[in-house]
């Protein structure tokens, strides 16, 4: 066989292999329209658990930020699936891209973002989406452990589910149902827009808060995103952690922006350490790692 033909054959084989791998990845995801209790539906993108033990896998549910969709946060969803979790990324239609664009047209850029994240109806609908995701997963099997993760407006959803007080009129229920075993809040908002001072003092379950030194907030700058952790009361075994990533911006946590390649592995490794530590019953902080400062209580 000539060198040219060997190259052509090798290239063809690589293309076939790539197509097979892409097909495998595609087959590991499932799109669902899950019914909500109000008669509407929420789109779910389900990532199958990998490398886990036999039986029903633990469940990770991911809530995107304002203007996002179930197609985002792929780096986080794939990492959770590799950890052995059935992973559901919810699509919050009432606070997705169309809703954000409408608010921006009416109020301007930042005022539009603020209007959407402080919309009580949009937040209540997000919590109905959470219920839809939980019911769909429960129809498949009963997971031994459930964790809710969210970024930005999704971190607000995490806090409202866990029982944080709010000043925008989201009632309990749908807020405060506390249906998960642990929570992960990426770039949570401090007091002033959705939450009052001392909003988080009643949350006792394991919680990981992650933010960055360049993670700007709607009110108060990057430091405001650390306030929720300081208000948490602490939990048995010191399972309430906060990590501050050096140089991380708000959009890095969504898998976007300059520096995301450095930030993403720090995020996913810290989440893995947190969940593994809780599972071991000790919640001991890992050894200090370059690029992030961690605290626990």
Where do the protein language model's features map onto the residues?
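Primarily recognizes the serine-hydrolase "nucleophile elbow" in alpha/beta-hydrolase
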Residues: 133-202
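Alpha/beta-hydrolase-fold serine-hydrolase catalytic core, especially in secreted/extracellular enzymes
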Residues: 247-249, 254-297
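Serine-hydrolase catalytic machinery in alpha/beta-hydrolase-like enzymes
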Residues: 34-142
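The feature captures the conserved acid-bearing segment of alpha/beta-hydrolase catalytic domains
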Residues: 171-244
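Bacterial N-terminal signal peptides
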Residues: 12-21
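Glycine-rich His-Gly loop
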Residues: 62-66, 152, 188, 212-213
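Bacterial N-terminal signal peptides that target proteins for export
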Residues: 2-13
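Boundary at the C-terminal end of the N-terminal hydrophobic targeting segment
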Residues: 26-28
């Amino acid at each position: 066989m000539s060198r040219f033909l060997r190259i052509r054959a090798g290239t063809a084989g690589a293309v076939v292999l790539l197509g097979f791998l892409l097909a495998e990845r595609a087959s590991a995801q499932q799109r669902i329209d899950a019914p909500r209790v109000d008669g509407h539906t929420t789109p779910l993108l389900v990532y199958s658990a990998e490398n886990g033990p036999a039986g029903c896998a633990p469940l990770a549910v991911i809530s995107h930020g304002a203007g996002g969709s179930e197609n985002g946060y792929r780096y986080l969803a794939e990492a959770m699936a590799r950890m052995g979790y059935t992973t559901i990324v919810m699509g919050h239609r009432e606070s997705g891209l169309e809703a954000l664009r409408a608010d921006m047209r009416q109020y301007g850029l930042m005022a539009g973002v603020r209007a959407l994240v402080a919309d009580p109806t949009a937040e209540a609908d997000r919590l109905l989406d959470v219920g839809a995701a939980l019911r769909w997963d429960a129809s498949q099997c009963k997971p031994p452990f459930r964790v809710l993760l969210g970024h930005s407006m999704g971190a607000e959803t995490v806090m409202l589910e866990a029982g944080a007080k709010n000043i925008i009129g989201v009632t309990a229920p749908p807020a405060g149902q506390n249906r998960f075993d642990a929570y992960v809040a990426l770039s949570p908002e401090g007091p002033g827009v959705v939450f009052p001072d001392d909003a988080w003092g009643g949350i006792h379950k394991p919680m990981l808060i992650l933010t960055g030194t360049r993670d700007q907030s709607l009110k108060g700058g990057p430091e405001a995103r650390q306030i929720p952790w300081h208000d948490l009361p602490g939990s048995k075994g010191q399972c309430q952690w906060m990590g501050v990533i050096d140089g991380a911006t708000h959009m890095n946590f969504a898998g976007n922006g300059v520096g995301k390649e450095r930030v993403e592995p720090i995020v996913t490794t810290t989440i893995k350490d947190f969940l593994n530590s809780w599972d071991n019953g000790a919640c001991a902080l890992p050894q200090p790692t370059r690029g992030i400062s961690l605290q626990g209580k």
